[in-house]
């Protein structure tokens, strides 16, 4: 079988459409799956000896959250080491990373697999994987045809990585080094709230502004701080962490600013504080709202003048530190209550960030579940850990008051319970493995199967209604903010909401 010019032209056009948008790779994968008639396909980005899914088709949604470390996936390692098309025979002894992850085929294993490494020059930047349930599914395609597909995909991925780096570093093309490995904290999520947060992180990271990160317990505020530091000019210098809630009042000042020998009982030598350790780098103050008013005053002085005094020392030391602070409290309310200094609040919140709770992140819960499943698989030496349809349904309808941290612990506990009831190294997580409070669930199929008796207008209105509801929830029912998120005029949004029955 050979590809027609029209087929190749269509693939090339899909690769160029909407460059810079979230779905540019999804269109490629969808087109390839149709052309190659495979059961599943994935586009993966290579970074620091792991493959990160950028787009999938025909695979369970949680695959997008998984991070495939080469040492745990021999097929992917073989693709990474190869300089050409890799075909895995049906009787290959190497486990397929997507076994159990094709919806409706969870109990079956992939029988045909092709891997296409993607290169920019001599540098591996990603891979395309094609999977089928029939052993000879890809025999009709020659290696030359598959190389052509790989070349088109590699060009698109290469350009996207270059644009991404130019946008994040604000560099001129002549200064760019697009294929060097750039450390980047993994922030998993494609929901509107997380997409907006990532954009704001990218904006503020390049500056030297202090940042106040707000969010409920367990939402990942420390991860946000790491992402800001790693994307900043200070990334080559230390990121120092201090949990203010765990500081006894008697040692808090010493922890922050250090002390000299003999400053107090037990001070047997000079000791640097966190500000000195973070000099030329970043200091992350977690739970900043727990600091006493006395310490808040001393912290304010450092932010104002850039110098510190060790406990027991009259000399001042200059420090160059960027401060990132996090809190699960409403500091505006704390200021009004007299528990937090207004001047310190304004110094810290030059660029405030809000981390959305997991219950407002939609399908991100499934992506995160996939990430934690893959972590468990590696740590416990399992061949696979997958979620059943019932488990996915439960996770999507539970509110997670403990947010991402609660989800992580729930997945780890579920894996232990599932292993206790099943022999072997393959684990399928069922709803009964999760000890959540009672949740009212629709049938598992209800979330995935569309209403077939709707006409086009009814289906469109249902989609619009649900989109507006989600946007309102994420913006605390602020219609102006909702309109900005949906990129529409607020007056038009009000009219549409009335027509859809969302407003009186």
From Swiss-Prot:
Cite the entry's keywords alphabetically.
ATP-binding, DNA-binding, Nucleotide-binding, Phosphoprotein, Transcription, Transcription regulation
**What are its GO biological-process terms?**
phosphorelay signal transduction system
User: Which ranges carry the Sigma-54 factor interaction domain?
Assistant: 187-416
Q: Which residues form the signal peptide?
A: none
Residue ranges of DNA binding:
479-498
Q: Which InterPro entries match?
A: AAA+_ATPase, GAF, GAF-like_dom_sf, Homeodomain-like_sf, NorR, P-loop_NTPase, Sigma_54_int, Sigma_54_int_dom_ATP-bd_1
Classification via PANTHER family: ANAEROBIC NITRIC OXIDE REDUCTASE TRANSCRIPTION REGULATOR NORR, TRANSCRIPTIONAL REGULATORY PROTEIN
Q: What HAMAP family would the database entry show?
A: NorR
UniProt protein name: Anaerobic nitric oxide reductase transcription regulator NorR
């Amino acid at each position: 079988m050979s590809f027609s010019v029209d087929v190749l032209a269509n693939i090339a056009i899909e690769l160029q459409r909407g460059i810079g948008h979230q779905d540019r790779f999804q269109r490629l994968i969808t087109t390839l799956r149709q052309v190659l008639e495979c059961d599943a396909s994935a586009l993966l980005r290579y970074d620091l000896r792991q493959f990160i899914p950028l787009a999938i088709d025909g695979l369970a949604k949680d695959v997008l959250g998984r991070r495939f470390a080469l040492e745990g996936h021999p097929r992917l390692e073989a693709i990474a080491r190869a300089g050409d098309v890799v075909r895995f025979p049906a009787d290959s002894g190497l486990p397929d990373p997507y076994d159990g992850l094709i919806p409706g085929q969870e109990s079956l294993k992939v029988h045909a697999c092709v891997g296409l490494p993607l290169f920019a020059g001599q540098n591996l930047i990603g891979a395309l994987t094609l999977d089928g349930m029939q052993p000879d599914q890809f025999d009709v395609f020659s290696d030359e045809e598959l190389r052509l597909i790989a070349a088109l995909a590699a060009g698109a991925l290469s350009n996207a990585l270059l644009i991404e780096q130019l946008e994040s570093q604000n560099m001129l093309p002549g200064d760019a080094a697009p294929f060097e490995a750039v450390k980047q904290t993994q922030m998993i999520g494609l929901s509107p709230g997380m997409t907006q947060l990532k954009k704001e992180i990218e904006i503020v990271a390049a500056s030297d502004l202090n940042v106040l990160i707000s969010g409920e317990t367990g939402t990942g505020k420390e991860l946000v701080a790491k992402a800001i530091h790693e994307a900043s000019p200070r990334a080559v210098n230390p990121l120092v962490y201090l949990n203010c809630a765990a500081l006894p009042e008697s040692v808090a000042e010493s922890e922050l600013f250090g002390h000299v020998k003999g400053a107090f009982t037990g001070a047997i030598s000079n000791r640097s504080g966190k500000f000195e350790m973070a000099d030329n780098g970043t200091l992350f103050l977690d739970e900043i709202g727990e600091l006493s008013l006395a310490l808040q005053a001393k912290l304010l002085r450092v932010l104002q003048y850039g110098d510190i005094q060790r406990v027991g020392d009259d000399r001042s030391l200059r420090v160059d530190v960027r401060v990132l602070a996090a809190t699960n409290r409403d500091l505006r309310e704390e200021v009004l209550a007299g528990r937090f200094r207004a001047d310190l609040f304004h110094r810290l919140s030059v660029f405030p960030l809000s981390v959305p709770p997991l219950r407002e992140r939609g399908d991100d819960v499934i992506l995160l579940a996939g990430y934690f499943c893959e972590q468990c698989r590696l740590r416990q030496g399992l061949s696979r850990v997958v979620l059943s349809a019932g488990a996915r349904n439960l996770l999507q309808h539970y509110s997670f008051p403990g947010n991402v941290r609660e989800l992580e612990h729930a997945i780890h506990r579920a894996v232990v319970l599932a292993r206790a009831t099943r022999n072997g190294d393959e684990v399928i997580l069922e709803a009964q493995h999760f000890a959540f409070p009672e949740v009212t669930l629709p049938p598992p199929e209800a979330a995935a199967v569309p209403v077939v008796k709707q006409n086009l207008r009814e289906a469109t209105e249902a989609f619009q209604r649900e989109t507006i509801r989600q946007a309102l929830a994420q913006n605390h029912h602020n219609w102006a903010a909702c309109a900005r998120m949906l990129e529409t005029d607020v007056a038009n949004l009000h009219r549409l909401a009335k027509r859809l029955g969302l407003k009186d």
